From Swiss-Prot:
The keyword Transmembrane helix does not apply. The keyword Chloroplast does not apply. GO terms for cellular component: cytosol. Zn(2+) binds at residues 145, 148, 183, 186. It comes from Bacillus cereus (strain B4264). It catalyses: thymidine + ATP = dTMP + ADP + H(+). This is Thymidine kinase. It is found in: Cytoplasm. PANTHER family: THYMIDINE KINASE (PTHR11441), THYMIDINE KINASE, CYTOSOLIC (PTHR11441:SF0).
Amino acid sequence: MYLINQNGWIEVICGSMFSGKSEELIRRVRRTQFAKQHAIVFKPCIDNRYSEEDVVSHNGLKVKAVPVSASKDIFEHITEELDVIAIDEVQFFDGDIVEVVQVLANRGYRVIVAGLDQDFRGLPFGQVPQLMAIAEHVTKLQAVCSVCGSPASRTQRLIDGDPAAFDDPIILVGASESYEPRCRHCHAVPANKDK
């Protein structure tokens, strides 16, 4: 039996908000730089919480990033000398992101994506479940529940301190002022704001 060492694979980092997804993506990108590999980082234009041209973790770590509006815009920035392509907040990209990631991995790039696997309602979010299914490596991170201290796998959206209703808009970019990590048992999603 022969071991064939081929380049090109997909890594998914997922979990709730405040679980360390961006921090882990930044850590992996920095490690590639120590190995003298060339990396590029992308983020969706919609993510402008801390910076327009950096991926920034909640604890302040950051790495330069190229903001893009559409998934296929990523191809415009890909060059042959690159080894690693990292994409943060992947849940905010359009449906083409799955194909883009597949094409890049098939071309021999190590592709690292990070994003929320569930929306604030606790349902699968965007294209992340599909990316998890096709990835060679999946890392699911957990935060700490802000209510009871248990491992948190959910993201609680708060509006004026109260849980957001099930029918509220799915995408609302924010940080600690509008979201907090919760465990399954402390996570709440009222069916109607009036109830």
